[in-house]
Amino acid sequence: MSHLDPTLLVLLVLAALGIISHNMTVTLAMLLLLVIRITPLNHFFPWVEKYGLTIGVLILTVGVMAPIASGKITVQAVLNSFMNWKSLLAIVIGVLVSWLGSRGVSLMSNQPSTVAGLLVGTVLGVALFKGVPVGPLIAAGILSLLIGKS
């Protein structure tokens, strides 16, 4: 019997979770990683590991800002939002989340043993609860508060 790569098995299980939960994002991400792993493209993994998060945040930011850039949300509407208590609360929460994310990056860099749990938790949250895969950095930031590390 040939040796089965456990990493491939993990990617397949996570892709299956994506299919079962009808979460195309998880499914496509896992299948893309699977293709990269089993083809000569696997030599790009260091690049993906180094820049993937930055590229993902860039794409997410473009998607979030597109309505402003296209004019669908006007400058006046943006300015008016600062007069609303919900928008002001959103600003405060945005600052808090950014701070948590920075703590998360630090924790993930200094304690790589936490990364696997954070990633599995995030993928499960995305696959099973229709979450959005922006959680690892924030989750790591919250974890850093709970375990007292930065």
Swiss-Prot record:
One of its GO terms (cellular component) is plasma membrane. Coiled coil: none annotated. The keyword Methyltransferase does not apply. It is a multi-pass membrane protein. The chain crosses the membrane at residues 8-28, 51-71, 88-108, 123-143. This is UPF0756 membrane protein plu2726. It comes from Photorhabdus laumondii subsp. laumondii (strain DSM 15139 / CIP 105565 / TT01). Belongs to the UPF0756 family. Keywords: Cell membrane, Membrane, Transmembrane, Transmembrane helix. Pfam families: DUF441 (PF04284). Its main location: membrane. The lineage of its organism: Bacteria, Pseudomonadati, Pseudomonadota, Gammaproteobacteria, Enterobacterales. It is found in: Cell membrane.
